[in-house]
Design a protein with these regions (language model features):
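Short, well-ordered beta-strand micro-motif
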Residues: 29, 104-108, 129-132
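A short coil-to-beta-strand element that immediately follows conserved catalytic motifs
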Residues: 76-87
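A generic structural micro-feature
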Residues: 19-21, 95-101, 120-125
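Nudix hydrolase/Nudix homology domain
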Residues: 45-47, 121-176
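Active-site-adjacent beta-strand/loop module that shapes the phosphate/pyrophosphate-binding cleft
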Residues: 89-117, 150-152
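Acidic, metal-coordinating catalytic segment for phosphate/diphosphate chemistry
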Residues: 1-26
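Conserved Nudix-box catalytic region and its N-terminal flanking loop in Nudix hydrolases
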Residues: 31-71
Length: 176
């Protein structure tokens, strides 16, 4: 039984009413020359950025991002490093694809000492490279390309739907 406010009798939300939406998180990792770290996965075509799906055990998007980047590249962001949320993208479901929510974090730029320590997970990643943004965008798969392009344009937080900015969201609110 649900009450008028949508909660169950005990103040909980009935599980049947909750959407099952996959959440993933990716990372923009640059070198000091402004080149973006991109990866070639073994399990799908094209290039991507480091990141992956959030675990269902209560992991947060930021924790998923750190875990996936460490698993795929060996890079681990320490507690003292500052990253920023670059965008959040709502992907609509499509036939055979569940859709989901994608977080993209900008980890900033790293030096050769850090990036020289990249060790890819060969079961998942066949190759990596640092590419200037134009080249990286041309290699990335379309949904990721849109997200990265939007996130790097103006370096402001972006809300996207299917990889595209939503008119009226993210702009300055009108003064009233």
């Amino acid at each position: 039984m649900t009450t008028d406010d949508g909660f169950g009798a005990e103040g909980t939300i009935p599980d049947a009413d909750l959407p099952a939406i996959p959440v993933s998180a990716g990372a923009l990792v640059f070198d000091h020359a402004g080149r973006l770290l991109i990866l070639k996965p073994t399990y799908k075509s094209g290039w991507t950025i480091p990141g992956g799906v959030m675990e269902a055990d209560g992991e947060t998007p930021w924790e998923a991002c750190r875990r996936e980047v460490a698993e795929e590249t060996g890079l681990d962001i320490g507690a003292g490093h500052q990253a920023r949320l670059a965008c959040m993208d709502f992907r609509r479901p499509r036939p055979g694809k569940p859709g989901g929510i994608r977080f993209l974090f900008d980890w900033g730029a790293f030096g050769d000492a850090t990036l020289g320590g990249i060790v890819v997970q060969p079961e998942e990643i066949s190759e990596y490279r640092l590419a200037d943004l134009r080249t990286a965008l041309s290699l990335l798969r379309k949904p990721i390309r849109r997200r990265v392009r939007a996130a790097t344009r103006g370096r402001r937080l972006r809300y996207l739907e299917d990889g595209l900015p939503v008119p009226g969201v993210g702009e300055r609110p009108a003064r009233r």
